[in-house]
Amino acid sequence: MNNSLDYLAYPVIVSNHRQSTTFRKKLDFGHYVSHKNRIQIAKPTVDTKPPVAHTNHILKLSKLQGEQKKINKIEYENKQLCQKIANAHRGPAKVDCWNEYFSKSLNRETRNRELVRITMENQGILKRLVDRKPHYDRRASEIDWQNSRRYIRNTTRYLLSQNE
């Protein structure tokens, strides 16, 4: 404590040995120290600590693993490209600018199946036409022809030639 202010805080009026200033100073200092200790060990009744942070909420392992896979894939592709570049520099010169484009159709198989089906149907129709036998009677048609020639000969004014 400050000694210059002792005379104001503790006046020198001594009527009793219990009222001596040094004893009173000791008591006040003891109370002060105990009060200071109680303040230091006091705990607040309101919890002012931050909430408990779980690492699995902050640090997403699945995202880290996904990023690591992407990085590994990129590194692998870079390594492959470097090997191709090294092989191109090491080996003989080659022309590799041929752009062979093959038309890719989404329904090529369907069109091929349809074409095969139509071809088979056409071949079947052609076979039926070739195998078909005439159904008219030749003898009856010749008799009919002779009758019509006779009718024409009888009705015409001029004679017909023999080969008509």
Swiss-Prot record:
Pfam families: Hmw_CFAP97. It comes from the Eukaryota. Belongs to the CFAP97 family. Residues 61-90 form a coiled coil. Required for male fertility through its role in axonemal doublet stabilization which is essential for sperm motility and fertilization. This is Sperm axonemal maintenance protein CFAP97D1. Expressed exclusively in testis. It comes from Homo sapiens (Human). One of its GO terms (biological process) is sperm axoneme assembly. Keywords: Coiled coil. The lineage of its organism: Eukaryota, Metazoa, Chordata, Craniata, Vertebrata. InterPro entries: CFAP97D1/2, Hmw/CFAP97.
